[in-house]
From Swiss-Prot:
Record's protein name: Antitoxin VapB46
Transmembrane segments: none
GO biological process: one example: positive regulation of growth
Native source species: Mycobacterium tuberculosis (strain ATCC 25618 / H37Rv)
Superkingdom as given in the UniProt entry: Bacteria
Gene this protein is translated from: vapB46
Physiological role: Antitoxin component of a type II toxin-antitoxin (TA) system. Upon expression in M.smegmatis neutralizes the effect of cognate toxin VapC46.
Length: 102
C-alpha cells in the first residue's frame, strides 16, 4: 500500500481518490458499519464519507434540539383571529401582486 492510497490518521481513515475508485465497495461497507472516511486529492482533504444520520429530518431536528414536540393537540388550538374590516389576507395580497407581474 502506498502512503497516498490509504492511511489511518487518529481514528479516521484517509483515502485518496484513486483508492476510493479501486475499493469503493469495501469502503462503503465500512461506512455502513459506522466509520467515517476522509477522501483526499493529492494529499489534500476534499470530502468526508460518513454514514447517514438515523431517522428523517423531523427526528434529526428533534435530536439536535432545534425543534420541540408539540404540547397541544390540534383540536385544542384557539380559533383564528378575525381580521379588522378592510384588512387583506397576506395570500390575497401576494396573489394581487403576482397578477401585475404577468
Amino acid at each position: 500500500m502506498t502512503p497516498t492510497a490509504c492511511a489511518t490518521v487518529s481514528t479516521m481513515t484517509s483515502v485518496g481518490v484513486r483508492a476510493l475508485r479501486q475499493r469503493a465497495s469495501e469502503l462503503l461497507r465500512r461506512v455502513e458499519a459506522g466509520e467515517t472516511i476522509e477522501i483526499t486529492d493529492r494529499g489534500r482533504p476534499v470530502a468526508l464519507l460518513s454514514p447517514l444520520p438515523q431517522g428523517g429530518p423531523y427526528e434529526q431536528l428533534l435530536a439536535s434540539g432545534e425543534i420541540e414536540r408539540a404540547t397541544l393537540d390540534v383540536v385544542d388550538l384557539p380559533e383564528p383571529l378575525d381580521l379588522d374590516a378592510g384588512v387583506e389576507l397576506p395570500s390575497v395580497t401576494l396573489a394581487r401582486l403576482r397578477e401585475h407581474e404577468r
